[in-house]
């Protein structure tokens, strides 16, 4: 019987293949893994046990998902602003109001590059956790409200699904490179549900604008941090 960590790793890659548009070479390699073909030599950096998924493969898939989430978040934010932002002063209402605003994160890429990899991994995991509830509520509300375009709903649903996949993958990476790491940063609780479900259209639209603005910002951070980590542990 395959080890549980190996099975979870293969399942994560299978989920990613089914939901992401990857380069042909990665698709082929992933499909082989999904079909049970284990042609990789054992490769578990700093982790005991019989694992056959190379660390580089985990990082490649994580960077692809993070980059895709960032693209989707940017497109969703722009689409929402185009559809609902005309004549609205949304920007002034959402400055410094993200629920992740008070997380201590590097101010720029240079600062992130000088941050220890243990801290970056904890930040990525905490940021991903902090978006569990907001994304779930956004998808639920978009499903039951008229007005939002199908494209916005589709992107929100894909980001929700892929954020779960990405979180599992990053947690696997953390266990691989820092097997003794047990502490993660506390993640902020989102408290905007009442605004997101408000009957007042202006309140509701402002809440969605704030969410999509903050998601765009945090998705950029997550993608940047994972790319930096990839270059520390595998060839860039």
Curated annotation (Swiss-Prot):
The UniProt record lists the keyword Ribosomal protein: no
Residues annotated as glycosylated: 89
Disulfide bond positions: 98-214, 231-236
Keyword Transmembrane helix: no
Signal peptide: 1-36
Keywords, sorted A to Z: Disulfide bond, Glycoprotein, Hormone, Secreted, Signal
GO CC terms, sorted: extracellular space
Biological process according to GO: cell surface receptor signaling pathway; female pregnancy; mammary gland development; positive regulation of biosynthetic process; positive regulation of lactation; positive regulation of receptor signaling pathway via JAK-STAT; response to nutrient levels
Subcellular location: Secreted
An annotated Gene Ontology molecular function: hormone activity
Pfam families on file: Hormone_1 (PF00103)
Protein name: Chorionic somatomammotropin hormone 1
Taxonomic path: Eukaryota, Metazoa, Chordata, Craniata, Vertebrata
């Amino acid at each position: 019987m395959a080890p549980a960590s190996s099975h979870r790793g293969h399942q994560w890659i299978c989920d990613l293949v089914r939901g992401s548009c990857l380069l042909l070479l990665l698709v082929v390699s992933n499909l082989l893994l999904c079909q049970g073909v284990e042609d990789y030599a054992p490769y578990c950096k700093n982790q005991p046990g019989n694992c056959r998924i190379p660390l580089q493969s985990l990082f490649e898939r994580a960077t692809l998902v993070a980059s895709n989430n960032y693209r989707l978040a940017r497109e969703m934010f722009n689409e929402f602003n185009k559809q609902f932002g005309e004549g609205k002063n949304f920007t002034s209402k959402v400055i410094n109001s993200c629920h992740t605003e008070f997380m201590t994160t590097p101010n720029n890429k240079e600062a992130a590059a000088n941050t220890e990899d243990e801290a970056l991994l904890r930040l990525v995991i905490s940021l991903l956790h902090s978006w569990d509830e907001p994304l779930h509520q956004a998808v639920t509300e978009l499903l039951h409200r008229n007005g939002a375009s199908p494209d916005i709903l589709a992107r929100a649903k894909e980001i929700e699904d892929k954020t779960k996949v990405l979180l599992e993958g990053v947690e696997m990476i953390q266990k691989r490179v820092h097997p003794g790491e047990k502490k993660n940063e506390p993640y902020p609780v989102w408290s905007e549900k009442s605004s997101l479900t408000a009957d007042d259209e202006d309140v509701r639209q402002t809440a969605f604008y704030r969410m999509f603005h903050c998601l765009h910002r945090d998705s950029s951070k997550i993608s940047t941090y994972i790319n930096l980590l990839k270059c520390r542990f595998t060839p860039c």
